[in-house]
Amino acid sequence: MSRTQQAPMNAGSASGVQVASPLSQDNSTIRVSGTLRLRGDNGTRNNGEDLTTTRHIRWSEDVVDNEGMGKKSSKVCCIYHKDRPVGESSSESDDTDSSSDDCSDCDSDTRIPTHKGDQGGEASSRCSPSRLAERKCGTSCSKRHSKQRSRRHMSPNAYEKMPKFKGQPGKR
């Protein structure tokens, strides 16, 4: 037979421990079996505040409806666009340099081809083969020759597109 003993609970704690110990103790073998019973929080804080109301998001009157869909969300979605100089368009790439960059192996007034299909002309006789290959690829002299892929046209992502409403065609 075993008896069940309950440990005293603190006033601020909602969990308790029950320890079961055997009644008869044999000196040769002590066998202890324990049962741990866990209970959830009773729903109040130490100051008597109800947790069910404090854990939920409360929307103030100035919260804007998320994209007109009748939903309010606590997630913040920001799309960062890097600041650009006034004359630079958003379609220009930050990684590529223009063909007017000076190459140490070429004359600055020599036309340097920037695409694979362009003919080198005088530039092929004055530039080293590695520099010419870099210039035909459109990369600057200091960059590696591995960027041969053309960049795809950038389209707006899901957060930048306006949602389509089924009930109101053409409005919004």
Swiss-Prot record:
Any Pfam family matching the protein: PPI_Ypi1
Annotated Polar residues bias: 1-32
Keyword Nucleus on entry: yes
InterPro entries in the cross-refs: PPI_Ypi1 (IPR011107)
Compositionally biased region (Acidic residues): 91-107
Alphabetically ordered keywords of this record: Nucleus
Compositional bias (Basic and acidic residues): 108-119
Cellular component aspect of the GO annotation: nucleus
Basic residues composition bias: residue spans: 142-154
Keyword Acyltransferase: no
Subcellular location: Nucleus
Region annotation (Disordered) ranges: 1-53, 83-172
GO molecular function: protein phosphatase 1 binding; protein serine/threonine phosphatase inhibitor activity
Protein purpose: Regulator of type 1 phosphatases which maintains protein phosphatase activity under strict control.
Family per record: Belongs to the YPI1 family.
Protein known as: Type 1 phosphatases regulator ypi1
Organism of derivation: Aspergillus clavatus (strain ATCC 1007 / CBS 513.65 / DSM 816 / NCTC 3887 / NRRL 1 / QM 1276 / 107)
Lineage start: Eukaryota, Fungi, Dikarya, Ascomycota, Pezizomycotina
